[in-house]
Amino acid sequence: MKSIVLASSRGIGKGIADELESISSEVIRTSSSDLDTSDIDNVKDFVSKNKETDILVLNTAGPPAKDFYEIREDEWLKYYNQLFYSFVYILQNIKVKDGGYIFLMTSFNIKEPDPKLIMSNCYRLAFTSILKSLTKDFAKRAVSCINIAPGPIDTDRLRNLVDDVDELGKTLPMGRVGSTVEIGRFVKSIIENDIKYLTGVTINFDGGHSNYVI
């Protein structure tokens, strides 16, 4: 079984790739140095070398926190590629084999938008819509599509967004932020237990932090 895990040199991607090592015969990991999803030529080169897989984990770093009126045109275009079009191209050109899985890593902010993370909110939500739209076609080949929407997880990105992760954790329902290992184990458990009927869903992974119902 082959797995491709994007942005897996650290953070959530690494947590997933580390767990998949024990159940996958081949795990292809990428970092920003060998796959920059904001560079479509780089994405095309990667895809040309990776035509198919059993497990595809679509994951990428997020944009900086910025006020809407301060976001430049070049930033809109960069993160359009990084968060949206790169995934479109990958999904169009890397075949996920029958019985496989597609995991999309987004954010709980797609349902509860953060005004400082507008680029992340809108582009992640747009691709979530694409994956949902394709779910029924993928289901015909027993390919399950699962969107995981993490809340505060202990990653470099979170540490760049907040001043004190430990203090943030104290304000959360569980008294802590989540760990990348937890997400990795969750993904592994779905694959390892051959859970197929769970598809076309967005799963909150936020320790009860979000306020929305569905």
Regions of interest found by a model, annotated:
Residues G62, Y69-Y89, F103, S120, ...:
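Catalytic Tyr-X3-Lys loop
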Residues A139, S144, L198-G200:
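Short, small/polar-rich loop/turn modules that mediate ligand/substrate recognition or access, typified
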Residues Y101-K140, P152-I153:
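Catalytic loop of short-chain dehydrogenase/reductase
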Residues K188, T199-I214:
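Short C-terminal tail/terminal secondary-structure segment
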Residues S9, G13, A17:
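N-terminal Rossmann NAD(P)H-binding glycine-rich loop of SDR-like oxidoreductase domains
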Residues V57-A65, G208:
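Conserved NAD(P)H cofactor-binding loop of Rossmann-fold oxidoreductase domains
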Residues K140, N147-T171, V213-I214:
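A glycine/serine/threonine-rich, flexible loop-to-helix segment
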Residues L172-I183:
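A conserved structural motif in NAD(P)-dependent oxidoreductases
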